[in-house]
Structures are given as structure tokens and as C-alpha cells.
Amino acid sequence: RPSFCNLPVKPGPCNGFFSAFYYSQKTNKCHSFTYGGCRGNANRFSTIEECRRTCVG
């Protein structure tokens, strides 16, 4: 699994409402969150499938 999968979820400071997914090292699962649209990190995926494929394996 890439190291960025272990980054904490980061919605960012902007006020957008974008559906996204992140990997949780604690649960070994992908979860949904609302991304604000700016200054997040690499642990953010457009689909849960992409998150699972990249981080869960």
C-alpha cells in the first residue's frame, strides 16, 4: 500500500461540498467524507472502488 494511504483524512479549508473517499489505517477500510475542494492530501479518492484498489488491496 502506498504511504499516502496512511495520511489522516483532510477535508481542507475551502467551502465546497465534494463527495470523496479516504482510507482509514485504523479500520483498514475506505470511508466517505466531504472534501472542501482545496488543500487536501493524497489520501482522497473519487470512488470507493479506487480507494479500495489503491489502499486496501
Curated annotation (Swiss-Prot):
BPTI/Kunitz inhibitor domain sequence ranges: 5-55
An example Gene Ontology molecular-function term: toxin activity
Disulfide bonds, paired cysteine numbers: C5-C55, C14-C38, C30-C51
Keywords of the record: Disulfide bond, G-protein coupled receptor impairing toxin, Secreted, Toxin
Subcellular location: Secreted
Cellular component terms per the entry's GO annotation: extracellular space
UniProt entry tagged with the keyword Secreted: yes
Tissue specificity note: Expressed by the venom gland.
Record's comment describing the protein's domains: Exploits its two major loops and engages more positions in its interaction with V2R. The pharmacophore defined by numerous amino acids positioned in loop 1 (9 to 18) and loop 2 (34, 39 and 44) may be at the origin of the absolute selectivity of this protein for V2R.
Role: Interacts with vasopressin V2 receptor (V2R/AVPR2), probably in a selective manner. Inhibits vasopressin binding human V2R in the nanomolar range (Ki=8.16 nM), and also moderately inhibits vasopressin-induced cAMP production (IC(50)=224 nM). In vivo, intraperitoneal injection of this protein into rats increases diuresis by 5.5-fold, without any loss of electrolytes.
Family to which this protein belongs: Belongs to the venom Kunitz-type family.
Name of the protein in question: Mambaquaretin-2
Annotated source species: Dendroaspis viridis
Taxon lineage: Eukaryota, Metazoa, Chordata, Craniata, Vertebrata
